[in-house]
Regions:
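Basic, nucleic-acid-interacting segments
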Residues: 1-135
Length: 135
């Protein structure tokens, strides 16, 4: 019988610490009154255009470098269309096809043994709203 090796993949989300949202000038603060930290762009009002937050790009690039990823020559963003209750626009701005970092690797020590952790990609994307459930 052929030896099999388990490969476990994890998707991790990190909230960017910044003054404003990734593509919107609206304040980036979670624990405030609902529907107060919004801008016309967050609701896809006609004529509104996103502007990427430079602070967020710098932080994502720093993470990409720290994890030994390859960085692209240009930043490209995609519009991912889907319906979800906390997605007021009906689409999400993301880097689904052209991430800010790809093919990374870090080594970790486990029981005196060095093991590689491979990073598929790091990408910026918006989460323009959230649902809070209090029971």
């Amino acid at each position: 019988m052929k030896k099999q090796i388990a490969v476990i993949g994890l998707e991790m989300h990190c909230e960017m610490k910044s003054n404003s949202k990734v593509f919107s000038p609206a304040k980036n603060a979670y624990s405030e009154i609902p529907n107060t930290n919004i801008a016309p762009l967050d609701m896809a009002f006609p004529g509104t255009l996103p502007v990427v937050n430079k602070e967020c790009v710098k932080k994502a690039l720093m993470m990409s470098i720290a994890l030994n990823c390859k960085q692209p020559r240009y930043l490209v963003f995609d519009r991912k269309n889907y319906y979800y209750p906390d997605l007021p626009k009906g689409y999400q701005i993301t880097q689904m096809n052209n991430p800010i970092g790809v093919d990374g690797k870090i080594d970790i020590e486990v029981n005196d043994k060095i093991l590689p952790v491979y990073i598929h990609d790091i990408h910026l994307e918006e989460d323009s709203a959230s649902l809070d459930h209090f029971f």
